[in-house]
Regions:
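N-terminal pre-ligand scaffold of iron-sulfur
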Residues: 1-75, 89-90, 104-132
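A short acidic, glycine-rich active-site loop
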Residues: 78
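Short cysteine clusters
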Residues: 57, 81-84
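A conserved acidic, glycine/proline-rich C-terminal tail/linker
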Residues: 85, 94-96
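C-terminal structural segments of small proteins and small subunits
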Residues: 96-102
Length: 132
């Protein structure tokens, strides 16, 4: 994972309430920006932990979700690209099946914290990928 930029580390972005991410369920999309232009990042929960990735397949630079926020295949065990069927481990972003086997999704730094409103998921941006 890319290390958070020190000046942005204190500016963590609240993504959602923790209970909005369910293991193997729908993800949350967030607009982002990188040097090459606009992007989208997404956040999911797997095995009780939140994870975040750039919404771009490692095979062809297209968004993964089937329908907006639908990243898991039917078993809820793998993330799957809707275009060519690449299968990714949700906890590592590693492609374990399909045309880009061995490649990885671009991971984000994610934390879960207690807040006055309840537990929430936060994205800690880095120097290459920031909130839009």
């Amino acid at each position: 994972m890319t290390e958070p930029v020190p000046d942005l580390q204190d500016k963590a972005v609240r993504v959602c309430a923790s209970d909005e991410l369910v293991d193997g369920g729908a993800g949350v999309r967030v607009p982002a920006a990188e040097a090459s232009g606009d992007a989208v990042v997404f956040f999911v929960r797997y095995d009780g932990q939140p994870y975040g990735y750039l919404n771009r397949c490692a095979h062809v630079p297209m968004e993964l979700d089937w329908n907006e926020g639908q990243f898991f295949e039917s078993s809820g065990l793998y993330l799957m690209c809707a275009t060519h069927g690449a299968i990714y481990e949700p906890d590592t972003g590693k492609c374990v099946g399909g045309p880009c086997r061995g490649a990885r999704l671009r991971a984000l730094t994610v934390e879960e914290r207690d807040t006055p409103e309840g537990r929430a998921v936060f994205w800690l941006p880095d120097d290459a990928l920031r909130p839009a």
